[in-house]
Amino acid sequence: MADSKKSIYQQAGEWGVPFGLYLSCAAVTSIFADWFMPLQFLFLILLLGTPLVVYYFQRRRFIQDDGFTEYAGLWMLGIMLFLLGTLICSLIVFLVLQYVRPTYIVDQTQAAVDFYKTLPQMKDSEMLEAVQFAIDRKILPTPIEMVTSMFWFVTFTGSLLSALTALIAQRPLPGKRRERKQ
């Protein structure tokens, strides 16, 4: 009988879809949190839960391999999860920013400028003038530019997070001893 064990990449491909939907939920709750305040709390829970979700997938793979998955394999699984998950999330966030909330970027930037103008030390700030200039001239980043930046940021930070969770996911299985390679 042929070995039907999936490669790290196949596994990440399967698990990346639900992970992408998870990341999408977090991003969309963040986008709509200014309209419905309880979403801020939900966003915080989803954000803090991200390492646990990555750990869950890495640990699941480690257990499937009877504790013999190397650190590099678990880390690669995490990287690929973030790569695929962020790709799915980016598509959804782009659609939301482009078609559902097209003024989101301008609204949030203007809200930040208005808030900082209330602070005495920021009243005559050149930074605020520059940002207000960008708002007035309509030269703020477009949804695709924001999503592209988000994609690279989340993928990079996710790879670092995966390095950490892979270390934890490798803890020995109960009742099993790992043989050291000589």
Predicted regions and their residues:
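Short, charged juxtamembrane terminal tails flanking transmembrane helices
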Residues: 1-5, 172-182
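Alpha-helical transmembrane segments of multi-pass membrane proteins
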Residues: 10, 14, 18, 76-85
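Membrane-helix interface/capping segments
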Residues: 58-73
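Functional transmembrane-helix hotspots
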Residues: 91-120
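Low-complexity, acidic polar-rich segments
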Residues: 120-138
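Individual transmembrane alpha-helix segments
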Residues: 133-156
